[in-house]
């Protein structure tokens, strides 16, 4: 229940019983198991990788974790700022902040601005640990939105990808007209 209203969300999992996939993730320096309860950073190889590889990485995590493009109803023609969020246990809060800062720096290479990084206590877990919610908020300036949704976009999420394409076409048309 959130603000007096019952909210329902869909959640999907993929279960793969292949040790080879686990070995590959380990070799690529990706987190294994619960991401909220461990330290991890952007892999070193990714920081020096070509832009196309960085784009694929960002598009895949944005497909899962970046908010869906949606217009502001109060200000016609504008969009809400995209938000990339993650949760971390209190012990790993600084690691989460650093990870989001690394994502922000990688996005700058594509001409995408991040405007804020917010943290707030979310809840206490069953074991009594405090979980923190962190949000990397991107600029809602048209140029930054076009760069985010056109240059990076969303992989593995057809709905977000479709809405992002519509938004890019609208913003590009609006820019030409005005």
Language model features with spans:
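Internal intein/HINT superfamily modules and their associated LAGLIDADG
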Residues: 1-178
């Amino acid at each position: 229940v959130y603000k007096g209203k019952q909210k329902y969300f869909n959640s999907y999992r993929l279960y793969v019983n292949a040790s080879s996939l686990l070995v590959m993730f380990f070799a690529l320096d990706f987190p294994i198991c619960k991401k909220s309860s461990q330290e991890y950073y952007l892999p070193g190889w990714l920081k020096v990788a070509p832009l196309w590889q960085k784009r694929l990485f960002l598009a895949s995590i944005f497909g899962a974790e970046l908010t869906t493009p949606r217009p502001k109803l109060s200000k016609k023609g504008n969009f809400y700022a995209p938000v990339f969020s993650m949760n971390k246990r209190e012990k790993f809060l600084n690691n989460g902040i650093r990870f989001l800062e690394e994502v922000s720096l990688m996005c700058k290479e594509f001409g995408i601005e991040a405007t804020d990084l917010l943290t707030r206590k979310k809840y206490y877990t069953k074991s009594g640990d405090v979980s923190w919610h962190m949000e990397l908020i991107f600029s809602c300036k048209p140029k930054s939105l076009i760069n985010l949704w056109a240059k990076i976009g969303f992989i593995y999420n057809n709905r977000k990808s479709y809405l992002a394409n519509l938004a890019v076409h609208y913003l590009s048309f609006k820019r030409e007209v005005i």
